[in-house]
From Swiss-Prot:
Function in brief: Succinyl-CoA synthetase functions in the citric acid cycle (TCA), coupling the hydrolysis of succinyl-CoA to the synthesis of either ATP or GTP and thus represents the only step of substrate-level phosphorylation in the TCA. The beta subunit provides nucleotide specificity of the enzyme and binds the substrate succinate, while the binding sites for coenzyme A and phosphate are found in the alpha subunit.
Pathway named in the protein's UniProt entry: Carbohydrate metabolism; tricarboxylic acid cycle; succinate from succinyl-CoA (ligase route): step 1/1
Keyword field contains Heme: no
Entries under SUPFAM superfamilies matching the protein: Glutathione synthetase ATP-binding domain-like, Succinyl-CoA synthetase domains
Positions bound to Mg(2+): 199, 213
Protein name, as recorded: Succinate--CoA ligase [ADP-forming] subunit beta
Catalysed reaction equations from the record: succinate + ATP + CoA = succinyl-CoA + ADP + phosphate; GTP + succinate + CoA = succinyl-CoA + GDP + phosphate
Subunit-level organization: Heterotetramer of two alpha and two beta subunits.
The keyword Nucleotide-binding belongs to this UniProt entry's keyword annotation: yes
Gene3D superfamilies listed in its UniProt record: ATP-grasp fold, A domain (3.30.1490.20), ATP-grasp fold, B domain (3.30.470.20), Succinyl-CoA synthetase domains (3.40.50.261)
A GO cellular-component term linked to this record: cytosol
Family: Belongs to the succinate/malate CoA ligase beta subunit family.
Enzyme Commission number: 6.2.1.5
Length: 386
């Protein structure tokens, strides 16, 4: 679950981390109230969206007067935000964050993230903060320090000394940095985060390290341990099909292809995506209905896939061990009978009640092509999608 910047800052503030004062507003009058309460004469207004690249795409506005602050907030609250990180979506800006300007001497990058390759958390730092870290990693890899962290949730003294040397911090600044890193680590572990990114962490002209921006992602599988974070979920920042899939309890990820997929089992689903690519096609989604989906869930899952107008072909790929093929067939029939238009459908059914399931589909008059192997199904689906 992604958090908005203000939500991440709310969490970090509880860990006594240095963050400039900020207010969150949903309307211009709320912005005006905040400005008057703080007596700010200048500041920054930041769109609260689940996307990076805000600074480059008009989502962050520096204002040098109260009037400019109000104008910036009014503009942001009435626009849709998109960048190369929004996957083609235009995200609504429902809230803005207002904060005073800070006199910056240096900008740094700091992040703690789960490294899936090494199966452990890593900490990454760079003296090139405030920019796209992907560009730094690609063009100047020597400017990025990356270290694995112990599973205890602590950081060793020698690692902190290495960080201070790499970042060229003198002792007073290093002392601040050490404290910030330790507190960030504590928050990362206690909140079951998969990402905690500070960009930028800045050194002010008076010698203080301050967190200006924060991005945080909480592991969905650990949310049951953090019921207080339930209200942080913002469905307006997601594809409507992703939101519906969550409500239905389906494992769904929207992709940019043209072949809609309904598969049972994550391994089989990923193999299906791979073989479609092998034959020159591309999937419109990842959808794993699991082994215990009901007829209703199958029906809703198919309707969900078909609601994507980019889908030209439906590929149903079921290996019925736990899953009953007759249940899949019944759900398919119900879903197709509710569709105004039909698209080419390729079906591979194997396993429990496969003959019964096929008979149900044939007797219902559902236009489709049955195949007997994954490769045959993938090749046919790709051909029909062209």
């Amino acid at each position: 679950m992604h958090l908005h910047e203000y939500q991440a800052k709310d969490l970090l503030t509880a860990y006594q981390l240095p963050i400039p004062p900020y207010h969150v507003a949903t309307s211009v009058p709320e912005v005006e109230t905040a400005i008057q309460a703080e007596q700010w004469k200048a500041g920054v207004v930041k769109a609260q969206v689940h996307a990076g690249g805000r600074g480059k795409n008009g989502g962050v506005v520096i204002a040098h007067s109260p009037e400019d602050l109000l104008a910036a907030a009014d503009k942001l609250l009435h626009m849709q935000f998109s960048s190369n990180q929004t996957a083609g979506l235009s995200l609504p800006i429902n809230k803005v964050l207002i904060s005073p300007l800070v006199e910056i001497a240096s900008e740094y990058y700091l992040a703690i993230v789960i490294d899936r390759k090494h199966r452990c958390p890593v900490i990454m730092l760079s003296k090139a903060g405030g920019v796209d870290i992907e560009e730094v990693a690609e063009k100047q890899p020597d400017q990025l320090l990356k270290m694995t962290l112990p599973s205890s949730g602590k950081i060793y003294g020698y690692q902190l000394r290495r960080i201070a040397k790499f970042m060229e911090w003198d002792q007073p600044i290093a002392d601040q940095g050490n404290r910030i890193i330790r507190q960030l680590l504590q928050c990362f572990y206690e909140k079951d985060a998969s990402l905690l990114e500070i960009n930028p962490l800045v050194l002010t002209k008076d010698g203080s390290l301050v967190i200006l921006d924060a991005k945080m992602t909480i592991d969905d599988n650990a949310l049951y341990r953090h019921p207080q974070l339930a209200d942080c979920y913002d469905p307006s920042q997601e594809n409507i099909r992703d939101v519906l899939a969550k409500q239905l309890g389906l494992s769904y990820i929207a992709l940019d292809g043209t072949i809609g997929c309904l598969v049972n089992g994550a391994g089989l689903a990923m193999s299906t995506l791979d073989i479609l690519k092998l034959y020159g096609g591309s999937a419109a989604n990842f959808l794993d209905v699991g082994g215990s989906a009901s007829e209703k869930q199958i029906q809703e899952a198919i309707s969900l896939v078909l609601s994507d107008k980019s889908v030209r072909v439906l590929f149903i790929h079921i290996f019925g061990g736990i899953m009953d093929c007759a249940v899949v067939a019944s759900g398919l029939v119900s879903a197709m009978q509710g569709q105004k238009e039909t698209i080419p459908t390729v079906i591979r059914l194997e396993g429990t009640n496969v003959d019964k399931g096929k008979d149900m589909i044939i007797n219902a008059g559902i236009p489709c092509e049955f195949v007997t192997s994954m490769s045959e199904g993938a090749e046919l689906a790709v051909q029909l999608s062209r």
